[in-house]
Amino acid sequence: MTVSERLIPSPQGDPTLIVIPTYNEMETLPDILTRVWAHVPHAHILIVDDSSPDGTGEWVDSRREDEERLHVLHRPAKSGLATAYVDGMGWGIEQGYPFILQMDADGSHRPVDLPKLLARMAGPDKPDLVIGSRWVPGGAINGWSSKRVALSKAGNYYVRFCLGTPVKDATAGLRLHRSAFLAQHEVLGRVATTGFGFQVEMTELERSLGAVITEVPITFDERIAGESKLDSSIFVEELVMVTKGGLGRLTQAARRAFSK
């Protein structure tokens, strides 16, 4: 019997793997697991832990003893969000999960929104990527200042301007992937970023490779416990990556124009 045959199907008919990177998330993770399974009881969860000093990884190990839906990858040191997702999603593809969902461990993503992404993935257009978006009609953010909202909107506008993507929330962290598309195009092997720029890079990689991308509205909550992993280097990484992409796009357009 294969791994896929042993999996319990989700309400949408196929097993889904939820990948959650962690680093010192003991304050939030236990509650998140409970809430996730309350809304998507048939989903499997993979924790990718970077040797959290607060014992997050050890807690997951103990929880796994009586929970077959829970899995863990232990990494030797803090190595960045992008590599955590690449490792976790790669594991999911190898294990035969047809759908892989990215989710934060800090409580920012509401488990109640997960069925919406799963239902949209089952739509007749068979999307390859479903993004939980703050910036489409019906999307919302709780706990952010007006300045932070404006910066996020401006950042996403800059991404759309530079990269020519129609996606309204390219920096969103809650997203559902079709594994077959990732595997067919070897998307994970093309990732160059190490941090939070991963979200923008994955959006552009999948779009440029012909993915069918759609967005569904979600409510994003500001972290209420633990420490934020965001710092200025993350924004610099995203800015440099997007600007390079925009310049490359303009260069290609100019070459096409002059070659006519």
Question: What is the meaning of each model-derived region?
Answer:
Residues 1-13, 188-260:
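Hydrophobic helical membrane-anchoring modules
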Residues 33, 42-52, 73-74:
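Short beta-strand/loop segment that forms part of the nucleotide-sugar
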Residues 1-35:
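N-proximal low-complexity "stem/linker" segments adjacent to membrane-targeting elements
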Residues 73-94, 99, 111-196, 223-233:
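Acceptor/aglycone-binding surface of glycosyltransferases and processive sugar-polymer synthases
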Residues 27-31, 54-63:
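Acidic helix N-cap motif at the loop->helix transition within catalytic regions
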